[in-house]
UniProtKB/Swiss-Prot annotation:
<feature type="domain" description="ABC transmembrane type-1">
    <location>
        <begin position="22"/>
        <end position="202"/>
    </location>
</feature>
<comment type="subunit">
    <text>The complex is composed of two ATP-binding proteins (OpuCA), two transmembrane proteins (OpuCB and OpuCD) and a solute-binding protein (OpuCC).</text>
</comment>
<dbReference type="InterPro" id="IPR051204">
    <property type="entry name" value="ABC_transp_perm/SBD"/>
</dbReference>
<feature type="transmembrane region" description="Helical">
    <location>
        <begin position="63"/>
        <end position="83"/>
    </location>
</feature>
<dbReference type="GO" id="GO:0031460">
    <property type="term" value="P:glycine betaine transport"/>
</dbReference>
<feature type="transmembrane region" description="Helical">
    <location>
        <begin position="87"/>
        <end position="107"/>
    </location>
</feature>
<keyword id="KW-1133">Transmembrane helix</keyword>
<feature type="transmembrane region" description="Helical">
    <location>
        <begin position="148"/>
        <end position="168"/>
    </location>
</feature>
<keyword id="KW-0346">Stress response</keyword>
<protein>
    <recommendedName>
        <fullName>Carnitine transport permease protein OpuCD</fullName>
    </recommendedName>
</protein>
<comment type="function">
    <text>Part of the ABC transporter complex OpuCABCD involved in carnitine uptake. Probably responsible for the translocation of the substrate across the membrane. Involved, with BetL and GbuABC, in osmoprotection and cryoprotection of Listeria. Can also mediate weak glycine betaine transport.</text>
</comment>
<comment type="similarity">
    <text>Belongs to the binding-protein-dependent transport system permease family.</text>
</comment>
<keyword id="KW-1003">Cell membrane</keyword>
<dbReference type="GO" id="GO:0055085">
    <property type="term" value="P:transmembrane transport"/>
</dbReference>
<keyword id="KW-0812">Transmembrane</keyword>
<keyword id="KW-0813">Transport</keyword>
<dbReference type="GO" id="GO:0005886">
    <property type="term" value="C:plasma membrane"/>
</dbReference>
Amino acid sequence: MDTLKQLIDYYQTNGSYVMEEFWRHFLMSAYGVIFAAIIAIPLGVYIARKKRLAGWVIQIANIIQTIPALAMLAVLMLIMGLGTNTVVLSLFLYSLLPILKNTYTGIRNVDGALLESGKAMGMTKWQVLRLIEMPLALSVIMAGIRNALVIAIGVAAIGTFVGAGGLGDIIVRGTNATNGTAIILAGAIPTAVMAILADVLLGWVERTLNPVKNKRKPLTEAL
């Protein structure tokens, strides 16, 4: 009960500070995922057509994913210095694999009969991609973005070690305090809530975009 009271008191006293770090934390995570999506989605579409290249590209993304977060930040800090840019770049790198792999999988799993139907109707490669492949793969791609954002929110917590702030800053303050359990929770709870909300919201978007649950428009309507 004492911890709960201290937690409530902390929020009442430092509410604006917690909200500021909450939004900073979210924006770092969101920017990292957005930049990764800008690169990974076109790259995933490209390697879906280049089977030999796909293995190498996905393997490189896998290797990046296995690098410990603190080690990644330490290396990037030597190159870019302290601050949010270092964290955003590390989140960008960690977000590449789920988005890239899901884009590749989504495009590869499109029914070949639909592709042939589109070509038979005189569609160009760009039209086939825009009107058939991307709509059918969109829910799978969104699942990758969803996973990437949840991962990014967790990893962003250690951004405090390179002076980027975020909710990790509150958690570290708690670990340095003599009786800092309430302060640790003050940073950990919003981090968990953010990850859960991101997962639920993007999960809903993913289900909405699922072509199996939506009536497919005839190709003639799409044209």
